[in-house]
Swiss-Prot record:
Organism whose genome encodes this protein: Agrobacterium fabrum (strain C58 / ATCC 33970) (Agrobacterium tumefaciens (strain C58))
Class of this enzyme: oxidoreductase
Protein name (database record): 1-deoxy-D-xylulose 5-phosphate reductoisomerase
Family classification: Belongs to the DXR family.
GO molecular function annotation: 1-deoxy-D-xylulose-5-phosphate reductoisomerase activity; manganese ion binding; NADPH binding
Primary role: Catalyzes the NADPH-dependent rearrangement and reduction of 1-deoxy-D-xylulose-5-phosphate (DXP) to 2-C-methyl-D-erythritol 4-phosphate (MEP).
Keyword Manganese: yes
Pfam families with a match to the protein in the record: DXP_redisom_C, DXP_reductoisom, DXPR_C
Keywords in alphabetical order: Isoprene biosynthesis, Manganese, Metal-binding, NADP, Oxidoreductase
E.C. numbers: 1.1.1.267
Length: 397
């Protein structure tokens, strides 16, 4: 970090054993380790050995496993260290409640909602990697952040890029934002070719190193659809101001178009640690060891319009934006449920979008989210509908 007077920053990482979490800790190492950050709490799911190793290395005050059944294993792994151990939702809430000025919200899926909201309520600055907070509960979540008084710094490379491109600019001068998408491993595949795709094939991303959920979301472009909804809330945009362009090289991470016809873009190597570092050091920048761009070797940068016929996730995301209400929650919960069924081999790759659209149509009734209870209720309903549709497809197969 560039300003030692603010060191160390107190940091809690919700989801330290996942892809974002492990990269966050690598950034912490590069930015001074314990001299740069005081790790208050680390949370993980089933990888107890890694969680315990992280807690010991960084001297965390609290280590939490989200799995109640893994409590004794974690307690045993950290015996004699003086590190407090907790488990389950109560443990996640305790971690989010600790006196950390910065919280990395990296628990994937709906389970990350409650602890992230807890951190927001107490006024922590949130480095947001959890998409569900905005996709499912956008208005409610933003209201909570505002009331708590903390800042919201995006961690997704695309939203981090937009955030940086907007710095120092007039909001009224923004004409549109353009999120870039690599196109994933199936960018040039036909729907017939995609019909027989397995999870192992879908997880192989051409540019980025990511976890299973995000990798498959990139292949289906549901990940980009969720990012469209996130962008609307993060930057207070109309649905028609959010665009997507396919950029196979993943060098331009996103851009902002202004009313005078100019564009500002953020470029960099496809390494999520850059956006993580920016979120953890904002408004400064850290000294990070990542691959630098060599512009002389960048022979070309390609762009193409996304094909929504082959990748309907983008159309469904725009539909959720235009309909509003609880459609984001319905899309997210249905997609998450369909993803698990696809990974388990119960449905095909193309079935995911079909299931999501059917669930969204069933729940298109004008309801809005006034409280988190409304969001959780919609989430539960969407999952129930999705499971019914999945069961029908499994039976037919």
């Amino acid at each position: 970090m560039t300003n030692a007077s603010e060191m160390p920053r107190k940091l809690t990482i919700l989801g330290s054993t996942g892809s974002i979490g492990t990269n966050t800790l690598d950034v912490v190492r590069q930015l001074g380790g314990r001299d740069g950050f005081e790790i208050m709490a680390l949370t993980g799911a089933g990888n107890i050995a890694l969680l315990a190793e992280q807690a010991r290395e960084f001297g965390a005050q609290l280590a939490v496993t989200a799995d109640d059944d893994k409590y004794e294993a974690l307690k045993s792994a950290l015996a004699g260290t003086g590190i407090k151990v907790a488990a389950g939702m109560a443990g996640l809430e305790e971690a989010a409640s600790m006196d950390a000025g910065w919280v990395m919200a990296a628990i994937a899926g709906t389970p990350g909602l409650a602890p992230t909201l807890t951190a927001a309520r107490r006024g922590a600055d949130i480095a947001l990697a959890n998409k569900e907070c905005l996709v499912s509960a956008g208005d409610v979540f933003l209201r909570t952040v505002k009331q708590g008084g903390g800042r919201l710094i995006p961690v997704d490379s695309e939203h981090s890029a937009i955030f940086q491109c907007l710095t120092g600019e007039y909001k009224q001068a923004v004409e549109r934002i353009v999120l870039t998408a690599s196109g994933g491993p199936f960018r040039t595949w036909s729907r017939d070719e995609m019909s027989n795709v397995t999870a192992d094939i879908a997880r192989a991303h051409p540019n980025w190193s990511m976890g299973l959920k995000v990798s498959i979301g990139s292949a289906s472009m549901f990940n980009k659809g969720l990012e469209m909804i996130e962008a609307k809330y993060l930057f207070d945009l109309r649905p028609d101001q959010v665009d997507v362009i396919v950029h196979p090289q993943s060098i331009i991470h996103s851009m902002v178009g202004y009313t005078d016809g100019s564009y500002i873009a953020q470029l960099g190597s496809p390494d999520m640690r850059t956006a993580i570092s920016y979120a953890l050091t904002y408004p400064e920048r850290g000294n990070l060891s990542v691959e630098r761009l060599d512009f002389a070797k960048l022979a070309r940068l390609d762009f193409e319009a996304p094909d929504e016929a082959r990748f309907p996730a983008l159309r469904l995301a725009r539909m959720a934006l235009e309909r509003g209400g609880l459609q984001g929650a319905a899309l997210n919960a249905a997609e998450e449920t369909a993803f698990h069924a696809f990974v388990a081999g119960g449905i095909g790759f193309l079935d995911m979008a079909e299931i999501v659209e059917t669930v969204m149509d069933r729940m298109h009734d004008g309801r809005t989210a006034e409280t988190m209870d409304d969001v959780f209720s919609a989430d539960e309903e969407a999952r129930r509908h999705a499971l019914e549709l999945i069961a029908t497809k499994e039976k037919a197969a």
